[in-house]
Amino acid sequence: MSDENKPGEAAELDAGVAPEAQPETELTVEELIIRLEAEKADMNGQILRLLADLDNTRKRADRQVSEARIYAIEKFAADLLSVSDNLSRALDALPDSERENLTDAGKNLLGGIEMTAKELNTALSRHGVVPVPAEPGAVFDPNVHQAVAQIPSPQPSGTIAQLFQPGWKIGDRTLRAAMVAVSTGPAN
């Protein structure tokens, strides 16, 4: 005998299967319209939610690209801050009174250091790296200032009395906090 079904057997097999249950009552046209309108409203809601999700995803991606562009140089800029500090120290090491007595070679060297420091600071600011304000008398802000000492000074209590190392920001982030001494007020 073969395993293949004969045409008569297929009809017998199909006869044993119950046909799908038909709804007991058929929908009226009005009920069908109401049901289809509800499905349409549900689908429209789903589409609106998907469009809102798509828009939010696009905005989030744009924001992440913008932040990546701004903060991509953060580590490199932080490494350059010590170069800026050293150039400033080199310039501060020579008092103004002694600058007049320099030889031509010394004046050229000093001019080169000044130009290098200026160009470095210009390049940093061009890329959004800016100094943190930390002048004596300014209000101490723990978000951008690091207090390394408290000293009596003519400045009001809680304000900056002295700047030890300049701070820098890139965008909204503090790249390096300014190291300052905070005033305790005038000495009694």
Swiss-Prot record:
Region entry Disordered, spans: 1-24
MF terms (GO), sorted A to Z: adenyl-nucleotide exchange factor activity; protein homodimerization activity; protein-folding chaperone binding; unfolded protein binding
Disulphides: none
Transmembrane spans: none
InterPro entries: GrpE, GrpE_coiled_coil, GrpE_head
BP-aspect Gene Ontology terms: protein folding
GO cellular component: cytoplasm
Family: Belongs to the GrpE family.
Protein name: Protein GrpE
Organism: Hyphomonas neptunium (strain ATCC 15444)
Lineage: Bacteria, Pseudomonadati, Pseudomonadota, Alphaproteobacteria, Hyphomonadales
